[in-house]
């Protein structure tokens, strides 16, 4: 989908990717929101500075908002509608200046604005009825802020997704393969990823139908099961794709205008996921992950100096891996990239010429020596029974362990 975008958009995404690589955010969604909000402010400042120049060419950079209504409204209700447009999220509707300005997101789910949640619930309800939504045009003078949904993850245990339907094993495998490398799903655990797949809604689309239209408000992400689609930007065909591909990812992050028009070039079977469902799954997964890892982190003496907030941030950055008996986790001499915390299981630590020098079990840790001293791995670690570990990458090790790093240095066996 990225390759179907104009070069300017690809350049913007590359800048974003560079920021991600540099910051390695534990909360990707909030980092993204903050980043694009800043970029939008930069764009508005650029346009404002050049407003006289464009006025001289009869180009209106900051038009007054207009509205189209499917039914008459009173003056009072029209006033309310205008007010809502003026203060909506900057990512809701199409930006008419996308061709004028060319470019050269730490989230606490309990501290989000309720306004966007209400809007999303209303939109979700409208889609199930025959009454069409009221189209609103972009207003460039509105305040540039990003609203988030107020989603209470501790209430998710009783939540049932609207479109939940168990998929067959074959469907699960195909759909999992389709979303495996998508950056939005990389941090989901296997249970949450399976829930996402089972929440995908089947949609049949005939040949020639427009699936999404450039500039329209985006609420759905799509996976192509059967058929082929073409992508158009400004009426120019830029790409094609078929079974196993996906598009519309940005719609799951925020109300983003569609970057391209997608047309079915054959009869298609698609799977669709709406943004509200995805965000509930994502935040629910993060909340459960924090709860699960909090007990583990509190039980480890080396991490006792971390505050509750520090533990929460660390939990968000941890990944889980399972190793079977006899499987090598790290090998002596290899480059060290991860720090390991044993959730359960047992491992042997061995060195060449010395054999097994240590045995580790539940709530022990290893892999810190190479990261503390920027050295190759000093020993081989092998699972002796089924072992589940929480892993932390090198950048997260340096950023998130804080005062615990000093304790790790005191316990570093290479310094004794």
Curated annotation (Swiss-Prot):
Pfam family name, one: RIIa
Comp. bias intervals (Low complexity): 70-84
Cell compartments where the protein resides: Cytoplasm; Nucleus
BP GO annotations: adenylate cyclase-activating G protein-coupled receptor signaling pathway; cellular response to glucose starvation; cellular response to nitrogen starvation; negative regulation of Ras protein signal transduction; positive regulation of transcription by RNA polymerase II; protein localization to bud neck; regulation of cytoplasmic mRNA processing body assembly
Annotated region described as Disordered, given as residue ranges: 65-138
Residue ranges, annotated region (Dimerization and phosphorylation): 2-183
Residues with Phosphoserine modification: 3-4, 9, 68, 70, 74, 77, 79, 81, 83-84, 130, 145, 147
Keywords, ordered alphabetically: cAMP, cAMP-binding, Cytoplasm, Nucleotide-binding, Nucleus, Phosphoprotein, Repeat
Phosphothreonine modification, residue list: 129, 131, 144, 150, 160
GO molecular function terms noted in the UniProt entry: cAMP binding; cAMP-dependent protein kinase inhibitor activity; identical protein binding; protein kinase A catalytic subunit binding
Positions of the UniProt region annotated as Dimerization/docking domain (D/D): 8-45
Motif Inhibitor sequence (IS) in this chain: 142-146
Residues annotated as binding 3',5'-cyclic AMP 2: 302-416
Effect of residue 129 to D: Confers increased sensitivity to rapamycin and enhanced accumulation of glycogen upon TORC1 inhibition
Domain notes: The inhibitor sequence (IS) is a substrate recognition motif that docks to the active site cleft of the catalytic subunit rendering the holoenzyme inactive. Binding of cAMP to the 2 tandem cyclic-nucleotide binding domains (CNB-A and CNB-B) induces a conformational change in BCY1, causing the interaction surface with the catalytic subunit to be destroyed and eventually the dissociation of the R dimer from the C subunits.
Entry similarity comment: Belongs to the cAMP-dependent kinase regulatory chain family.
PANTHER family linked to this entry: CAMP-DEPENDENT PROTEIN KINASE REGULATORY CHAIN, CAMP-DEPENDENT PROTEIN KINASE TYPE I REGULATORY SUBUNIT-RELATED
Note: Present with 4280 molecules/cell in log phase SD medium.
Assembly with partners or alone: The inactive holoenzyme of cAMP-dependent protein kinase is a tetramer, composed of 2 regulatory subunits (R, encoded by BCY1) and two catalytic subunits (C, encoded by the 3 partially redundant TPK1, TPK2, and TPK3 genes). Activation by cAMP causes dissociation of the holoenzyme, producing 2 active catalytic monomers C and a regulatory dimer R(2).
Name this polypeptide is given: cAMP-dependent protein kinase regulatory subunit
Species name: Saccharomyces cerevisiae (strain ATCC 204508 / S288c) (Baker's yeast)
